[in-house]
Amino acid sequence: MAKFIFVTGGVVSGLGKGITASSIGALLKASGLKVFMQKFDPYLNVDPGTMSPYQHGEVFVTKDGGETDLDLGHYERFIDEELTKLSSTTSGKIYLSVIKGERKGDTSGKTIQVVPHITDAIKNKVYQAAKQSQADVIISEIGGTVGDIESQPFIEAIRQIRLEQGKENVMFVHVVLLLWLAASKEYKTKPIQNSVKAMASLGIQPDVIVCRSDSSSPKDIKEKISLFCNVPITNIIDAIDQDSIYRVPLALAKQNLQDIIIEQLQLKANAIDLTSWKQFNKKIDSSSQEIEISFVGKYIELQDAYLSVLESLKIAGWEFNKKIKIRWIQAETLNESNYNEILKNSQGILVPGGFGKRGIEGMMLASRYARDNDIPYLGICLGMQIATISIARDLLNWTDADSTEFNKNTTHPIFDYIKGIDRDNIGGTLRLGTMVTKLEKDSLVSKLYNSDVALERHRHRYEFNNKYKKDLESVGLRFSGIYEEKNLVEVIEMPSLKFFVASQFHPEFTSRPNKPTPLFKGFIKAIIENNK
């Protein structure tokens, strides 16, 4: 039978509940336990797929095509497991399923209420995750902050799960902010006390309190929190600011958080083995020389919009003992008169995914600069599309070459809507999830993957128009990755250049500590070799 850990947050949002939950998962996995993780978001969107990156940040795609919260990227990277749609649930998804059931007559004419119908649906998601994953431990993060009106059904649901399963099977971890007042030079615990009281008023007593701060809390402060919050002092854990999120598991392990959990939940675990985490942290420590990458995107004002791309770059850099320095370039600012000057010191150029017309002309100029100057280039999703269109415009002189996403009247639609995709609804209608890409023999990408196939995740609704394949091949473009089932182009490269590679899929979703995705590893290696 699975055990359950629920991670909640108090005082303020944005404390790093996701990193805390991920670190707990990493510690339990390092103790020989099978872990499954999930996130409950209180917002009423069915999923984040239609939300603006400026509102939500990155949409992380699971192997089965779930469009999910960016915290799932942290979960997968920390526990090195592929999660599923079951790992992401929103209030919108819960309410929609309950209302659909009522409309179909599944509720036998009963009055539909938050308790029990909504709370039962939430509990079913937790129990379903336990049944399908067959994990030893299910770790569920509750989004938002205790006291938020939107979170109350989730808090009530996990209270009921504790009642149903017992304290030896359910654990509550509460992440809070420990305030430091610089003026009076003292810590203030009252916000923590009030947060725990708010939890208690909803029927939940935290078993562990994780205190976020920029330094370790003194013993007397821990004693005070312990006394007023009714939590043993051994279960008051410091989570201080780190220069890398990948140091957090080791920091929590030093405070024996895994032992506290294993003891309360009566888990049969092995002695913890943190060898891989220690080795990874040594790579971080030994990385000194910087590599500067020009990151040409359209959502750069909110870096969380590209979270997995950034983490993938860091992980690949550390593999070569290099630090990654990002030079953020808003694609809209690039034009014919300034792009050479702005991009002239680029060691590598990356154009990530995105939707819509804004900024694409600047992205094409970045792609052109990489081609003309033989600078390592990596394009992802939209970054592949604009690279291909740019080649059609510059090398075939098709000046109006475009995607029908940007220009429905183009006479050279290099990219067009995927056949069979719903054109009327944008939610959940993209090509999503892991697909098998067949890699051409002796291509650069096949050498990077050391395989004739790549398993990567997708999120797009436009595809390359095979009508123009021979024309583009005639000017040196190689179509080196194909989804054979539907003959869709997945990877392009320019063999005449040192590293000019772009993929329709998103390789950033499969990067892991100590295991960088081949495209990112190859990109960083090419930059290093190009700058010797």
Swiss-Prot record:
GO annotations of cellular component type: cytosol
Active site feature: 381 (nucleophile), 506, 508
Keywords: ATP-binding, Glutamine amidotransferase, Ligase, Magnesium, Metal-binding, Nucleotide-binding, Pyrimidine biosynthesis
Region (Amidoligase domain): 1-267
Keyword RNA-binding set for record: no
Enzyme class: ligase
Residues engaged in binding L-glutamine: 54, 354, 382-385, 405, 461
Annotated InterPro entries: Class_I_gatase-like, CTP_synthase, CTP_synthase_N, GATASE, GATase1_CTP_Synthase, P-loop_NTPase
Catalytic activity as recorded in UniProt: UTP + L-glutamine + ATP + H2O = CTP + L-glutamate + ADP + phosphate + 2 H(+); L-glutamine + H2O = L-glutamate + NH4(+); UTP + NH4(+) + ATP = CTP + ADP + phosphate + 2 H(+)
Pathway: Pyrimidine metabolism; CTP biosynthesis via de novo pathway; CTP from UDP: step 2/2
Regulation: Allosterically activated by GTP, when glutamine is the substrate; GTP has no effect on the reaction when ammonia is the substrate. The allosteric effector GTP functions by stabilizing the protein conformation that binds the tetrahedral intermediate(s) formed during glutamine hydrolysis. Inhibited by the product CTP, via allosteric rather than competitive inhibition.
List of residues binding Mg(2+): 71, 141
Binding site for UTP: 13, 188-193, 224
Positions contributing to CTP binding: 13, 148-150, 188-193, 224
Annotated NCBIfam families: PRK05380.1, PyrG
Protein family: Belongs to the CTP synthase family.
Subunit structure: Homotetramer.
Further details from the record: CTPSs have evolved a hybrid strategy for distinguishing between UTP and CTP. The overlapping regions of the product feedback inhibitory and substrate sites recognize a common feature in both compounds, the triphosphate moiety. To differentiate isosteric substrate and product pyrimidine rings, an additional pocket far from the expected kinase/ligase catalytic site, specifically recognizes the cytosine and ribose portions of the product inhibitor.
Protein name (record): CTP synthase
Organism: Mycoplasma capricolum subsp. capricolum (strain California kid / ATCC 27343 / NCTC 10154)
Lineage: Bacteria, Bacillati, Mycoplasmatota, Mollicutes, Mycoplasmataceae
